[in-house]
């Protein structure tokens, strides 16, 4: 996606469009294909594209789907085991304007599981082993604490050259 104000504007536009599609009841895969086509058409004039990482979670069943267009890995932690979800689709806007599908991975989550979504500014372009190790070893209870630790540590792992964003979810039973 890049970094700086232009990349921020492009990703902001993508988020707004995707939110509108989803709030209107469009299913995630159709919404993402439409977003990809819209960005591809827009890109013919402005060269715009963006990575997309979308997590859909049914809080009643625990069924989750991770949708990706060119996004950094997503990590799921169950106990101390961390799995890595990746994809091969190009960023939205570059993935072909004909409604090319995003990568989709399905996973079942339950109380006590954690999900980590990061940008490539956190995961870096080198090995992301440090992210997986840090995520597996985290002993705290606060997603906010883990998020801040990952952002802070990413600068030492090649992430300082790009925008850095991390989102941590911990599922709890209520």
Give a label for each model feature.
Residues 2-5, 9-174:
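Conserved subregion of the PPM/PP2C metallophosphatase catalytic domain
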């Amino acid at each position: 996606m890049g970094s700086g104000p232009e990349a921020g504007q492009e990703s902001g536009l993508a988020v707004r469009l995707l939110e509108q599609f989803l709030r209107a009841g469009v299913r995630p895969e159709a919404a993402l294909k439409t977003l990809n086509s819209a960005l591809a058409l827009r890109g013919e004039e402005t060269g715009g594209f963006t990575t997309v990482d979308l997590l859909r979670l049914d809080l009643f069943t625990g069924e989750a789907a991770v949708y990706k267009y060119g996004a950094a890995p997503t990590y799921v932690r169950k106990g101390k085991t961390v799995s890595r979800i990746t994809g091969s689709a190009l960023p939205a806007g570059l993935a072909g304007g004909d409604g090319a599908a995003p990568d989709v991975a399905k996973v079942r989550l339950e109380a006590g599981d954690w999900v980590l979504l990061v940008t490539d500014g956190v995961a870096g372009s080198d090995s992301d082993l440090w992210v997986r190790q840090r995520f597996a070893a985290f002993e705290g209870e606060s997603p906010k604490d883990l998020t801040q630790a990952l952002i802070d540590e990413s600068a030492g792992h090649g992430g300082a050259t790009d925008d850095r964003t991390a989102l941590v979810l911990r599922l709890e039973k209520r």
